[in-house]
């Protein structure tokens, strides 16, 4: 999808503006080192291809569900609740992270989806579910943090493989990031970047 020069210039201006403001904002508050594995309870998916049913209730989150814009791609894959899938049904505010990439460039590896509703999605193999510790962290904030380029850069560096790369959760769960422990500040940061995302999406839609 092509974005016009005018829209591109506007978007770049917004990014520069927030990049300029954001450092002064974040360093005025308390940030702590936190390991990826400490933000919530993590569990890996299994192969559920045998359960695929075109008339199923649940949307399936698999490697093809992740996009470079961090939005869910509906591939039309469905399952029902069965003995095999029932433990992999996601809850609202869960995060899912893709641990594989179909290419060596790492366009989607480490990207995260924020689940927006209860009892609607099931996660497949190659995805790690993170049940956020909501006493400490806001899921919307972690969604923005984990999809940031500098966050994903660490994950890409930890990847293995050649034509198709992958990471092990056990390895990347030890990666440390600076995170504010103030939920009020988490909320403000999440809102800033959610607004930026919305503006970018709006400008892209205007190209059609």
Language-model segments: residues:
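Feature detects amphipathic, helix-rich regulatory segments
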Residues: 1-208
């Amino acid at each position: 999808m092509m974005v016009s020069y005018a829209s591109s210039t506007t978007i770049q201006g917004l990014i520069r503006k927030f990049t300029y403001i954001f450092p002064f904002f974040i360093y005025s508050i308390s940030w702590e080192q936190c390991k990826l594995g400490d933000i919530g309870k993590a569990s890996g998916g299994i192969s559920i291809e045998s359960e695929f049913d075109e008339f199923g209730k649940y949307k399936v989150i698999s490697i093809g569900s992740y996009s470079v814009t961090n939005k869910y791609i509906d591939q039309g894959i469905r399952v029902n609740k069965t003995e095999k899938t029932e433990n992999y049904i996601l809850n609202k505010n869960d995060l899912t992270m893709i641990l594989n990439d179909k290419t060596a460039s790492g366009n989607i590896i480490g990207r995260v989806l924020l689940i927006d509703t209860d009892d609607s999605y099931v996660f497949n193999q190659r995805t790690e579910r993170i049940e956020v510790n909501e006493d400490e962290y806001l899921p919307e904030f972690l969604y923005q943090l984990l999809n940031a380029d500098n966050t994903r850069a660490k994950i890409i560096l930890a990847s293995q493989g050649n034509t198709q790369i992958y990471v092990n959760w056990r390895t990347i769960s030890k990666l440390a990031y600076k995170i504010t422990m103030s939920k009020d500040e988490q909320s403000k940061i999440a809102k800033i970047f959610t607004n930026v995302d919305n503006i970018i999406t709006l400008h892209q839609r205007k190209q059609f």
